[in-house]
């Protein structure tokens, strides 16, 4: 068992929680954006569309960097098999719990909201399976991807550790320019793979499980490994936590390119491939922007921050059906998009916190939505000697 730092990375905990909670305004703004979703407002809002695109352009890339960082930290703490078991439990159990309790009722609700309940019996067996794959995994996709990544990293992390034992890690030097070139190449490589699949067998790209297990994992795995490397090499971590005007400017320009691709790109042409290249490098640069900002403002411990760090996963899991309920049944009665957006935030966050407090008082639910066993504190006094 290898030693790990005793000091908790408070700013990384906070950033991870905020990125999770950003899913709430992201999905609520999606209702009022120009993007087609399960439910949409009568008229889209340009500013809420821009806000939605901004969150979507970088949020999950930074999230997976932090996940990789903490995953490697636990990798050094536990034996290999126990590490895999602990990690898979912590993400797999909440995912499997949320399917029958959250996404299945959500799917049934949407069938009636969108008027598709009557046509369901007429679908082919494959169409039913694929629809269920998309709808039941839904916003839980990142948990499935984390399970896949954890399994792959049983081998990858072992290789990294073995290579470190045979080399001097203090001599490893990183620069943002070098990383940018690497991630640009990774983005191009991903685009080539996707385009090849599109040419050879396009229907597979519409398969839900293939999209989650293969394509999403393939895109986000470099960020996950980057997080592990940031834990290993202090110089790399310092590169991300030190503010960089170059990264900020590059991220801003990349976001403009992202918006232009969204506006003028075509799904039948190269829009998705171009997006993968842009978001690969944009995600890297935003790691610096977010980490440096968080390190400066969020690197402290407080009861309020700890509360939302602990609550973030549960709140994220329950917010999605609440958001769709709001969009389907309440949004049509609010004429102002901005008022609807603010009401949606209050509605979803308020109910999510109430549900979180309720679930804390039910040990079984607390275990199922966290994947962590409920620890009973021993109050017995130590025997006298």
UniProtKB/Swiss-Prot annotation:
<keyword id="KW-1003">Cell membrane</keyword>
<keyword id="KW-0012">Acyltransferase</keyword>
<feature type="transmembrane region" description="Helical">
    <location>
        <begin position="137"/>
        <end position="157"/>
    </location>
</feature>
<feature type="transmembrane region" description="Helical">
    <location>
        <begin position="239"/>
        <end position="259"/>
    </location>
</feature>
<feature type="transmembrane region" description="Helical">
    <location>
        <begin position="17"/>
        <end position="37"/>
    </location>
</feature>
<feature type="transmembrane region" description="Helical">
    <location>
        <begin position="173"/>
        <end position="193"/>
    </location>
</feature>
<comment type="function">
    <text>Necessary for the succinyl substitution of periplasmic glucans. Could catalyze the transfer of succinyl residues from the cytoplasmic side of the membrane to the nascent glucan backbones on the periplasmic side of the membrane.</text>
</comment>
<comment type="pathway">
    <text>Glycan metabolism; osmoregulated periplasmic glucan (OPG) biosynthesis.</text>
</comment>
<feature type="transmembrane region" description="Helical">
    <location>
        <begin position="91"/>
        <end position="111"/>
    </location>
</feature>
<dbReference type="GO" id="GO:0016747">
    <property type="term" value="F:acyltransferase activity, transferring groups other than amino-acyl groups"/>
</dbReference>
<feature type="transmembrane region" description="Helical">
    <location>
        <begin position="338"/>
        <end position="358"/>
    </location>
</feature>
<dbReference type="GO" id="GO:0005886">
    <property type="term" value="C:plasma membrane"/>
</dbReference>
<dbReference type="Pfam" id="PF01757">
    <property type="entry name" value="Acyl_transf_3"/>
</dbReference>
<keyword id="KW-1133">Transmembrane helix</keyword>
<dbReference type="InterPro" id="IPR050623">
    <property type="entry name" value="Glucan_succinyl_AcylTrfase"/>
</dbReference>
<feature type="transmembrane region" description="Helical">
    <location>
        <begin position="274"/>
        <end position="294"/>
    </location>
</feature>
<keyword id="KW-0808">Transferase</keyword>
<dbReference type="GO" id="GO:0009250">
    <property type="term" value="P:glucan biosynthetic process"/>
</dbReference>
<feature type="transmembrane region" description="Helical">
    <location>
        <begin position="60"/>
        <end position="80"/>
    </location>
</feature>
<feature type="transmembrane region" description="Helical">
    <location>
        <begin position="212"/>
        <end position="232"/>
    </location>
</feature>
<comment type="similarity">
    <text>Belongs to the acyltransferase 3 family. OpgC subfamily.</text>
</comment>
<keyword id="KW-0472">Membrane</keyword>
<feature type="transmembrane region" description="Helical">
    <location>
        <begin position="311"/>
        <end position="331"/>
    </location>
</feature>
<keyword id="KW-0812">Transmembrane</keyword>
<dbReference type="InterPro" id="IPR023723">
    <property type="entry name" value="Glucans_biosynth_C"/>
</dbReference>
<protein>
    <recommendedName>
        <fullName>Glucans biosynthesis protein C</fullName>
        <ecNumber>2.1.-.-</ecNumber>
    </recommendedName>
</protein>
<dbReference type="InterPro" id="IPR002656">
    <property type="entry name" value="Acyl_transf_3_dom"/>
</dbReference>
<dbReference type="GO" id="GO:0016741">
    <property type="term" value="F:transferase activity, transferring one-carbon groups"/>
</dbReference>
């Amino acid at each position: 068992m290898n030693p790990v730092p005793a000091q908790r990375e408070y700013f990384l905990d906070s950033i991870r929680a905020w990125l999770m909670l950003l899913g709430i305004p992201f999905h609520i703004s999606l209702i009022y954006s120009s993007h087609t979703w399960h439910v949409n407002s009568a008229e889209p809002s340009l500013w809420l569309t821009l806000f939605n695109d901004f969150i979507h352009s970088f949020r999950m890339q930074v999230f997976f960097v932090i996940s990789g960082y903490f995953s490697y930290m636990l990798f050094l703490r536990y034996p290999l098999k126990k590490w895999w078991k602990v990690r898979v439990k912590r993400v797999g159990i909440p995912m499997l719990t949320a399917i029958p309790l959250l996404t299945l009722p959500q799917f049934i609700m949407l069938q009636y909201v969108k008027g598709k309940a009557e046509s369901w019996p007429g679908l082919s067996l494959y169409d039913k399976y694929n629809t269920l794959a998309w709808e039941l995994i839904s916003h839980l996709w990142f948990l499935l991807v984390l399970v896949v990544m954890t399994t792959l990293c049983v081998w990858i992390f072992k290789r990294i550790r073995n290579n470190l034992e045979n080399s001097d890690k203090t001599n490893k030097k990183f620069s943002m320019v070098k990383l940018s070139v690497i991630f640009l190449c990774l983005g191009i490589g991903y685009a080539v793979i996707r385009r090849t699949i599109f040419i050879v067998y396009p229907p597979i790209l519409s398969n839900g499980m293939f999209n989650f297990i293969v394509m999403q994992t393939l895109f986000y795995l470099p960020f996950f490994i980057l997080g592990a490397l940031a834990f290993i090499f202090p110089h790399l971590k310092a590169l991300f936590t030190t503010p960089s005007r170059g990264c900020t400017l590059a991220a801003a320009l990349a976001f403009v390119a992202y918006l232009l691709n969204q506006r003028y790109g075509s799904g039948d042409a190269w829009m998705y491939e171009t997006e993968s290249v842009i978001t690969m490098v944009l995600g890297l640069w935003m790691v610096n922007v977010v980490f440096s900002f968080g390190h400066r403002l969020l690197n402290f411990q407080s009861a309020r921050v700890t509360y939302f760090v602990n609550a973030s996963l549960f709140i994220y899991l329950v917010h999605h059906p609440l958001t769709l309920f709001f969009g389907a049944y309440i949004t049509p009665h609010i004429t102002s998009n901005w008022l609807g957006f603010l009401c949606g935030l209050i509605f979803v966050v308020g109910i999510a916190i109430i549900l979180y407090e309720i679930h804390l008082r039910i040990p079984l639910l607390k275990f199922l939505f966290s994947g962590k066993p409920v620890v009973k504190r021993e109050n017995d006094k130590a025997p006298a000697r």
